[in-house]
A protein has these predicted regions:
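Hydrophobic alpha-helical transmembrane segments in multi-pass membrane proteins
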Residues: 1-106, 122, 168-218, 387, ...
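Core dinuclear metal-dependent hydrolase active-site scaffold
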Residues: 6, 16, 23-33, 37, ...
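Residue-level signal for inorganic ion chemistry
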Residues: 36, 90, 147, 299, ...
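Membrane-interface amphipathic/re-entrant loop segments adjacent to transmembrane helices
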Residues: 95-111, 121-179, 184
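Stable alpha-helical elements in mature extracytoplasmic
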Residues: 121, 255, 259, 267, ...
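Di-metal (Zn2+ and/or Mg2+/Mn2+) metal-binding site signature of metallo-dependent hydrolases
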Residues: 269-294, 376-388
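Short internal beta-strands
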Residues: 272-275, 297-303, 399-403
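Cap/insert and terminal regions of metallo-dependent hydrolase folds
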Residues: 362-434
Length: 439
């Protein structure tokens, strides 16, 4: 914009955006792969392409004669049109990269955009006044901080609502997002009857959410082995109750995000209990983050938990039973790892954490039923899933929670051959993604 005035040329927003993008990419061509670059360019492109048209549409529909009302509505229309324009390209990018779509973004921008605008000028003023006289700059900075605190409090308040965002890991939500995109394209082409399009979009969202939330209620049980990279996080559901076995992965953020997004996507906003098999990071590094995000009942583990497991412990509800077996009393953390047997009705699913062959032998001696599913111990390491366990339990299917191209070489080929010899169907999170077992 400034350069156009200097060289006496007409300012053209799309050309200016293209020039800015060109300058950035000339300096660093790899910036095109940066999410922040894509979101910034996409948001500005959406504002330039659509916001003015949306603003004109609102203004033509209703614009009062009273001066004060006109100013208020001009601000409202401006905030709405900028938010809608920026969302055209930013929402698909967020869905693609983060797997979620914010439903409070529109309201947050409407209530908080003014504070951000004033805070920007307040920061500049604070710097200038501070350069002249520091105490005066501090006063301006304090007043500016009130705006920022308001905005942060607003975001925290709105994001606490259960439907603050929807997650594309749910197929109905992903289909709704595609349907909404098609509706938007049709509306931008015809520019007629926006209420009909908005209503259709809202109705489709309600149907998608209802389908996502109600589907698990029609199942006797569900076991979900989340794809958390090199780690483990398993969700056990039955009879309206939800338990989590471990919450760890390649990073704590990834495992906590995966657990929360999955549970929210199916309408679960509270975990009845969390069982931490042992304190290795790839099994627990997301537990603290998840605890801070959603209410969790009792935690079970071998250290620093509500319930310390030193002997066989049973959790019984409806026709389900969760049995927690203690590990060996001495040795490494892996050898002390808890094992969890989930028995919804006549089914049996065993999770052995990082238990070793010696610990598995102790489990077999304690008494195990034939298994429908085995969540393979230690991500498929050759220190676990021994002959004794497999011959005693005869699992029909083995699930391996493992990260792609991990540096440990998991799962070990010896273990895969052993499972094949016992006729187990093998599913892996590095190949199949999140694995859901329903019954």
């Amino acid at each position: 914009m400034l350069l156009a005035g200097v060289v006496h040329r007409e300012y053209d927003p799309p050309t200016a955006l293209a020039a800015a993008v060109l300058c950035i990419l000339l300096g660093n061509p790899y910036a095109v792969r940066s999410l922040s670059f894509q979101l910034s360019v996409g948001s500005v492109a959406g504002i330039l392409a659509f916001s003015q048209r949306i603003f004109r549409y609102f203004r033509e529909k209703y614009f009062p004669k009273q001066k004060f009302a006109r100013k208020c509505l001009a601000y409202l229309y401006g905030s709405v049109s900028v938010t809608m324009g920026a969302s055209v390209f930013s929402v698909p990018l967020c869905a693609l990269y983060f797997g979620e779509v914010s439903l409070i973004g529109f309201l947050t921008n409407l209530l908080g955009l003014w504070a951000v605008s004033f805070a920007f000028y307040g920061i500049l003023l604070s710097v200038l006044l501070g350069a002249i006289w520091l105490p005066l700059g501090k006063i301006a900075a304090f007043l500016t901080s009130l705006l920022l605190r308001y905005f942060i409090a607003l975001v925290r308040l709105l994001s606490a609502f259960p439907l603050a965002a929807v997650y594309t890991r749910s197929l109905p939500i992903a289909l709704w997002l595609g349907f909404s995109g098609m509706l938007l394209a049709v509306f931008l082409w015809h520019r007629r009857r926006p209420v009909v399009y908005a209503g259709a979009c809202a109705l489709a969202l309600a149907i998608a959410v209802a389908f996502s939330w109600l589907t698990p209620l029609g199942e006797n049980y569900r076991v979900t082995v989340l794809d958390v990279g090199q780690g483990q996080c398993v969700v056990l559901q039955s009879a309206g109750r939800t338990y989590l076995v471990d919450c760890g992965g390649s990073t704590g953020q990834k495992s906590a995000d995966a657990a929360m997004e999955y549970l929210y996507s199916i309408g679960i906003f509270r975990i009845d209990g969390m069982i931490l098999t042992h304190p290795d990071a790839d099994h627990v590094n997301g537990a603290a983050l998840l605890t801070g995000r959603m209410p969790i009942g009792e935690t079970y583990g071998i250290a620093d938990t509500d319930v310390l497991i030193t002997q066989r412990t049973e959790i019984i509800f409806a026709d389900c039973k969760i049995t927690i077996f203690p590990g060996l009393t001495s040795g490494t953390d892996n050898e002390k790892s808890l094992s969890v047997l989930f028995q919804p009705g006549k089914r049996a699913i065993l999770i052995t954490g990082d238990q070793t062959v010696a610990g598995e032998n102790a489990l077999v001696a304690a008494g195990l039923p034939n298994l429908d599913y085995l969540v393979v111990g230690h991500h498929g390491s050759d220190t676990s899933t021994g002959e004794t366990l497999l011959s005693a339990t005869r699992p029909l299917c083995a699930v391996i929670s493992v990260g792609a191209n991990n540096r440990y070489g998991h799962p070990d080929q010896t273990v895969l051959d052993r499972l094949a010899a016992y006729g187990c169907t093998v599913l892996r999170t590095d190949q199949n993604g999140t694995i859901i077992i329903r019954g």
